[in-house]
C-alpha cells in the first residue's frame, strides 16, 4: 500500500513475554513500548496486541521501510545517537503523510540491548538525558497533546492500557 511508510513487528523477550507491540508517545515521559512484559499470547486491551493497526511509532529493532520513504524524510537523525532515533524517524514519516503500522503476525525474539548495552554509566546517562531533551524540543507539542493513537483516559504510567486513576 502506498500510504504505508513503515511496518513494525511484534517482538518477544526470551521468557516469552512481549518486548514490543508498538510504541506509545508519552510512556515514561517520552515514549515506551505498549504491553511490555505481558504474556506473548495475551490479546491485550481491545485485542490490540493481536491486531494490525496504525500507531505513532514502532521500534527500529525490527521495521521495514521503503527506500523512497527513508530518503524522503532524510533517514534517521544522527543527533539521536542511541535513544529515540527510531521514534523520531517514525514521527517524521507520519508527518510526511504516511502510516506507521504494527503487524502482530510478524513475530520475532529480540534480545534487547544485547548489542548496545544498558544505560549504566555516567556518560550513557548524560547522553540519554540529552536525547530526552532533544526529543522534547522536536516533538514537544506531541508530548503535550498526547499520542493520537492512545486514549487520553488511559494511564501513561503502565504499559497495559489501564485507566488513569
Protein language model annotation of sequence segments:
Residues 1-30, 99, 105:
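Conserved donor NDP-sugar-binding/catalytic core segment of glycosyltransferases
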Residues 1, 76-77, 151-152:
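Acidic/polar residues at beta-strand termini and the immediately following turn/coil
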Amino acid at each position: 500500500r502506498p500510504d504505508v511508510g513503515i511496518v513494525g513487528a511484534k517482538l518477544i523477550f526470551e521468557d516469552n513475554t512481549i518486548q514490543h507491540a508498538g510504541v506509545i508517545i508519552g510512556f515514561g515521559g517520552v515514549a515506551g513500548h505498549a504491553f511490555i512484559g505481558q504474556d506473548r499470547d495475551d490479546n491485550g486491551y481491545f485485542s490490540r496486541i493481536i491486531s494490525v493497526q496504525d500507531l505513532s511509532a514502532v521500534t527500529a529493532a525490527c521495521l521495514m521501510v521503503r527506500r523512497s520513504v527513508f530518503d524522503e524524510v532524510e533517514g534517521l537523525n544522527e543527533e539521536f545517537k542511541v535513544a529515540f532515533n527510531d521514534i523520531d524517524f517514525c514521527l517524521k514519516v507520519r508527518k510526511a503523510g504516511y502510516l506507521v503500522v504494527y503487524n502482530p503476525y510478524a513475530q520475532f525474539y529480540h534480545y534487547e540491548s544485547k548489542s548496545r548495552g544498558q544505560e549504566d554509566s555516567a556518560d550513557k546517562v548524560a547522553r540519554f538525558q540529552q536525547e530526552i531533551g532533544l526529543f522534547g524540543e522536536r516533538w514537544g507539542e506531541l508530548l503535550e497533546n498526547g499520542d493520537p493513537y492512545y486514549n487520553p483516559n488511559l494511564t501513561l504510567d503502565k504499559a497495559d492500557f489501564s485507566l488513569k486513576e
